[in-house]
Amino acid sequence: MKEKIVIALGGNAIQTKEATAEAQQTAIRRAMQNLKPLFDSPARIVISHGNGPQIGSLLIQQAKSNSDTTPAMPLDTCGAMSQGMIGYWLETEINRILTEMNSDRTVGTIVTRVEVDKNDPRFDNPTKPIGPFYTKEEVEELQKEQPDSVFKEDAGRGYRKVVASPLPQSILEHQLIRTLADGKNIVIACGGGGIPVIKKENTYEGVEAVIDKDFASEKLATLIEADTLMILTNVENVFINFNEPNQQQIDDIDVATLKKYVAQGKFAEGSMLPKIEAAIRFVESGENKKVIITNLEQAYEALIGNKGTHIHM
């Protein structure tokens, strides 16, 4: 059986100083060239990705054009928009590479919904800033229209709306994603952590929240029974005591040791810690599961064991 891999692309893979579609597509073109050897391998591949800058721009556009005739779309719908947009860009560049290689593989995007628990305590403590900055006066007006919304000051730059970041419970499209990935298809899924939804009677309803991309990627990898979760970030390896005089590079580590480092506070919250927590969950989800954390440039070398941080039981 060919190895099945979920590749979680970090925001740096599609980040650019310019926010134009052309600039972002150029960044994605460069990024996908780094994954070309993986596309040429027999591995079955699912790609997840972030959407922070893109959904931020969408929310600003929605706010600025909001009117009776062009009402602003809610966060869950903007999440779907960003999945389609970034998925389209990724498809275009991956298809270009597959054509150059004369490959018979195909690529496609699944707009992905992620179930969350409406009773998740994280809903009581929204922390994820989204959308544009507002003045104090603007916030006072907004809260008349949105009494349940929470706004917090953001490092002296103004006020921003904050939403919850609940844990993913299930990926609604995981069976479809698995079926496609088990063929010759490269699947793009769980963009931006997926669209958070809650079960309501006999259907699902979108909620105003943002799911951590690494947690969503771990849940997806577990549900489709992937062998490897590869988390691509902006560093080649995981370090303990990062940016300190006594920083130490990790090349290979077991989960038991990793848990000790987590308990000792060796990883920064909001940056490496969620990746480490996702790695632990995936490795513990079944036998012979492994996680690789590295940067985009070393993805293939890491997969064959030459680079990156390798996490296992």
Swiss-Prot record:
Pathway: Metabolic intermediate metabolism; carbamoyl phosphate degradation; CO(2) and NH(3) from carbamoyl phosphate: step 1/1
Annotated catalysed reactions: hydrogencarbonate + NH4(+) + ATP = carbamoyl phosphate + ADP + H2O + H(+)
Principal location listed in the UniProt entry: cytoplasm
EC identifiers of the protein: 2.7.2.2
Enzyme class per UniProt: transferase
Pfam family, one: AA_kinase
Gene Ontology MF terms in the entry: ATP binding; carbamate kinase activity
Location(s) in or outside the cell: Cytoplasm
Database matches in InterPro entries: AceGlu_kinase-like_sf, Asp/Glu/Uridylate_kinase, Carb_kinase
Full protein name: Carbamate kinase 2
Organism this protein belongs to: Staphylococcus aureus (strain bovine RF122 / ET3-1)
